[in-house]
Amino acid sequence: MTLAIVKEVPAGADGDDTTDLVVLSDAAGRMRVRADWVRGNSRRAVAVEEAVAKQDGVRVVHAYPRTGSVVVWYSPRRCDRAAVLEAIGGAKHVAAELIPARAPHSTEIRNTDVLRMVIGGAALALLGVRRYVFARPPLLGPSGRMVATGVTIFTGYPFLRGALRSLRSGKAGTDALVSAATIASLILRENVVALTVLWLLNIGEYLQDLTLRRTRRAISELLRGNQDTAWIRLTDGPEAGTEVQVPIDSVQIGDEVVVHDHVAIPVDGEVVDGEAIVNQSAITGENLPVSVVAGATVHAGSVVVRGRLVVRAQAVGNQTTIGRIITRVEEAQNDRAPIQTVGENFSRRFVPTSFIVSAITLLVTGDVRRAMTMLLIACPCAVGLSTPTAISAAIGNGARRGILIKGGSHLEQAGRVDAIVFDKTGTLTVGRPVVTNIIAMHKDWEPEQVLAYAASSEIHSRHPLAEAVIRSTEERRISIPPHEECEVLVGLGMRTWADGRTLLLGSPSLLESEQVKVSKKASEWVGKLRQQAETPLLLAVDGTLVGLISLRDEVRPEAAEVLTKLRDNGVRRIVMLTGDHPDIAKVVAEELGIDEWRAEVMPEDKLEVVRDLQDEGYVVGMVGDGINDAPALAAADIGIAMGLAGTDVAVETADVALANDDLHRLLDVRDLGGRAVDVIRQNYGMSIAVNAAGLLIGAGGALSPVLAAILHNASSVAVVANSSRLIRYRLE
């Protein structure tokens, strides 16, 4: 057999996309390629895996964002090596929206970790047999020491590598403590002790990693479930109507996806055929199934409990609602909570102190084993795990409830909020108003015309009032005249050009600002309607008032209860803001028991209210759902967007997004944030106590290096186990 090892060879030199690839090795059907642009970029790693997997003869491909390398297993006879390199290079330019929302395959592959544990365990077993079965002396001979040293270096490689990296950066980390103890034991010919310690530490690291991956796996299952394929119904050609099975990642927008009993819906889209009972808990957090018929919108991750649906795909992969959740969760797990700096400061100061204490112990006692023990027990690994494990578990818990938390810092703030600012429409109210009155204010206009032209102004708006007007025309089967152009006047209304006319639709303030006269009769109607908590919209055509439409939005049934519980849980200030008239705002505020409210506010006014509360020393939460809430959502200590499928600007700006519109989720956000901080504090207390106690006991000579390693592992595993309780915290 001939093996060809190619070192540091550029993969291409003709100006193509392979010029920045380096083939590190290529032998016996296994090729390793370095692609620096993959390093630290999990999404791009997925793109590489997807592109290479499509090439003929490729068996398995793993892209490693931690190292920037790509490993391809292929059939030498069937696979074109150049095509594989081309596919890797081409993946660099794949649009982000076309990359499936999943983790790289490499995140689940930890063969080397398992191999280290197996080899280390086997070596220890053989040494035990040698010592106790064959009654050989405990000290190893030259050949035995050489083998034991080799195995020790192999099992301790991750720690040695980490120590070198930390020393290059001028910081002595926890890996440096383990490495120093290992090197000392090898110099003193304590090979068995070193191997035992490293084997135990490797087991602990593997168990920690296994526990931490539960969150990512739980979130990924929301999108893919247990299925890798989907059924689609062909719509073109002679086989139209035939159902065929395809890989789930190949489903495209516009495909008609067929979903049967007990199968997760793989796309966001509109139901075009069939009816079913659907469990939407993955998206909304609600366990009660709902009935779905043709015309309804469904989301990926929802499960058909009973029935059959044909769904026309409107979003696939990471562009679906659940895909956005997964993307945000993965980004959020890199966000650092302020409390994390406590552990980092402790570790940064504690590691050098541990070296000093160990050196003093060696000088005073002359016992190298005791000094080694001090280094091992002083490793603040558990302290370093305290915050990220808890944050990761809590974010995963929230995602499974339909609460998208975009980072650890926001989670910590959620538990400290003591002032909340609410936007009224769509937040405290249902946000689905209905048209209650249509009044013509001009002799040449009929109510139906007023409604039709109002709908023309609102036809492309996603504002709840606009949607109510459109629904009303559809219910009355009134045709809507097309418009040529429209302009959104934020907080006031719309200006539209249709049929050669200029239309203004909005509040009386809009008409006054545009010099349109509002009659006494219209003003009386406006006042009367506002006292009934109805919102009047005035329609002016070419500078003349022609009609009035009023709409009413009901208060959410759970709003009063949630506000009461927020006050009971320590929220001292609750403020309601609305662009509506003061009369309407007053009626809603009185119904909900809100003392502080402001009406007719613009986006900058909402921002001002948030900043004023912050200046008074409050930790401010802002809850909203519209474009006009975005500045305040961004400025608040924690911004919460209602409805993940709502306004994209609000969802992108907010720190937390709720997948459904149930205000009870606000209580869950605060509860989860507070619980996460409690768990982090427990972790810190437990891990720091173990470090301190271990140092005292170790200095007295009561601990061996092996016992120190066991205690070190026990504290780390205890921290991870304590944090993992958050994964299932109050999740029913």
From Swiss-Prot:
- Single Gene Ontology BP term? copper ion homeostasis
Q: Which residues cross the membrane?
A: 105-123, 146-164, 172-186, 195-209, 342-366, 372-390, 676-695, 705-724
Q: Where does Mg(2+) bind?
A: D423, T425, D625
Reaction equation(s) it catalyzes: Zn(2+)(in) + ATP + H2O = Zn(2+)(out) + ADP + phosphate + H(+)
The record's annotation in CDD domains points to: P-type_ATPase_HM (cd02079)
Q: Deletion: any effect?
A: Deletion of the gene leads to growth inhibition in the presence of elevated levels of Zn(2+), but not Mn(2+) or Cu(2+). Deletion mutant shows strongly attenuated intracellular growth during D.discoideum infection.
- Does Repressor show up as a keyword for this record? no
Domain HMA: where? 29-96
Query: Induction: what does the entry report?
Result: Induced during infection of D.discoideum and by elevated levels of Zn(2+).
* InterPro entries, per the entry: ATPase_P-typ_cyto_dom_N, ATPase_P-typ_P_site, ATPase_P-typ_TM_dom_sf, ATPase_P-typ_transduc_dom_A_sf, HAD-like_sf, HAD_sf, HMA_dom, P-typ_ATPase_IB
Q: What is its EC number?
A: 7.2.2.12
Keyword Nucleotidyltransferase (UniProt): no
Q: Which residues form the active site?
A: D423
Q: How does it sit in the membrane?
A: Multi-pass membrane protein
- Any one Gene Ontology molecular-function term assigned to this protein's record: copper ion binding
Naming one, the record's GO cellular component terms include: plasma membrane
Q: Which family does it belong to?
A: Belongs to the cation transport ATPase (P-type) (TC 3.A.3) family. Type IB subfamily.
Any further remark recorded for this protein: Increasing concentrations of Mn(2+) does not affect the growth of the wild-type strain, nor that of the deletion mutant, excluding that M.marinum CtpC is a manganese exporter as M.tuberculosis CtpC.
Its recorded name reads: Zinc-exporting P-type ATPase
**Species assigned in the record:** Mycobacterium marinum (strain ATCC BAA-535 / M)
Which gene is the coding source of this polypeptide chain?
Answer: ctpC
